[in-house]
Amino acid sequence: KEKYASNPDVDTSRSNRNFHFVTPQRSYRAEAEKQIAEAGCRTRSDSVRVVEALVTASPEFFKGKKRAEIKEYFIYALDFIKEHQAEKTIISAVVHMDEKTPHMHLCFVPLTEDGRLSAKDIVGNRKKLTWWQDEFWKHMVKKYPELERGESASETGREHIPPRLYKEAVHLNSLRDKIMELLSGTNPLNARSRAAEIEKL
């Protein structure tokens, strides 16, 4: 199993199983700038040009499901996004099958119905994010009643962190646990070999 150094969860031998619903025609930045120019929007240096959403479910939900069933799940999820965001603004929708749990990365240009560039109006604050999550769950549970609503950030008080940082934290915790396990079993007879194992980590 070959792994990316930046993302140890990726199994490159399964990357050919990934699939697109929306394939980017150019770089995200270039596509966003094109749509923004066509809409006649003015931008600032700190304007959000692309919003990324991550769509998934628990590993248990996907367990035993065939590729066609997984694809159907994400098509239904994409339908929800299209109900609330103009389809032409969706510049990429790709399902990753090469990690532990199938998930879809979806990117769109945050253009409002009246042609403004405003991620704040679309995604907004924590309250608006909670609304998106609630409405998404209501949509999905119509077809998949076994799905449970995840904990809302507005209830837990936890801050959202990007997937990359979350994965790095999980990886570091895993390394810490391995090191502690090796150290706990270290004695004068195996100290050198244990030190070598820790260095390899």
State the predicted function of each range.
Residues 1-201:
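N-terminal nicking endonuclease/strand-transfer module with a His-rich metal-binding environment
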